[in-house]
From Swiss-Prot:
Keywords, comma-separated and alphabetical: Coiled coil, Endoplasmic reticulum, Membrane, Transmembrane, Transmembrane helix, Transport
Positions of transmembrane segments: 5-24, 111-131, 156-172
Gene: get-1
GO molecular function, one term: protein-membrane adaptor activity
Compartments reported by the entry: Endoplasmic reticulum membrane
Name this polypeptide is given: Protein get-1
HAMAP family named in the record: Get1 (MF_03113)
Main localization of the protein described in the UniProt heading: endoplasmic reticulum
Organism annotation: Neurospora crassa (strain ATCC 24698 / 74-OR23-1A / CBS 708.71 / DSM 1257 / FGSC 987)
UniProt family annotation: Belongs to the WRB/GET1 family.
UniProt topological domain (Lumenal) ranges: 1-4, 132-155
Stretches the record annotates as Disordered: 190-214
Membrane topology: Multi-pass membrane protein
One cellular component (GO) term of this entry: GET complex
Amino acid sequence: MPSLLVVIFVIELFVQLVNTIGAATINNLLWRIALSLPLPLSAQFAAQRKKQKEYLAIRRELNATSSQDEFAKWARLRRQHDKLLEDLEKRKKELDAAKTKFDRTLTTVRVVATRGLQWFLPFWYSREPMFWLPYGWFPYYVEWFASFPRAPLGSVSIVVWQWACTGVIKLVIETVMAVVGLIVAARQKQQEKQKAKQAVPAAGGGDSKAEEAK
């Protein structure tokens, strides 16, 4: 069984990553992965794409056919067009319903695996010490706060450990994002400078040609 310290840290890390990336982005990524797997859903999606290609081909041919000069052909293409369009709309509704169900399932699993455990574990292990502070190193009020709410005095409670993990992970993520933002901004400025340097000789060349013409 993994240590409770590690479990709490992993849960908080996952929660912060979801908050940073975005639940909708993660759902869309997992949806694309599900469509690429050999599942009935992916077969349904492939059939829908195939029908869509057929529909576009019929539509192009229909637009290129005159309803006056080639009425019989135009009428046949029109029937095929309407039938494929109706089939596509039906398949789209089915896929949209499957996507909605998929998102709800993921949301439920994510809430249970994160928010549920965030509340359940501190309640269930509120009296369990995560680890002990060195004896006599800290004053009473520090030991009392570290053991909040019901852990033995002189220990670090699961609630305080959870707070510490959340704070440290947030700080690290914000630092990494700030560093990445600075790197991206620096590269953009460097590219702009290079473009400006490339534009200057062109302007200078035009002036020299004008002087020669004079």
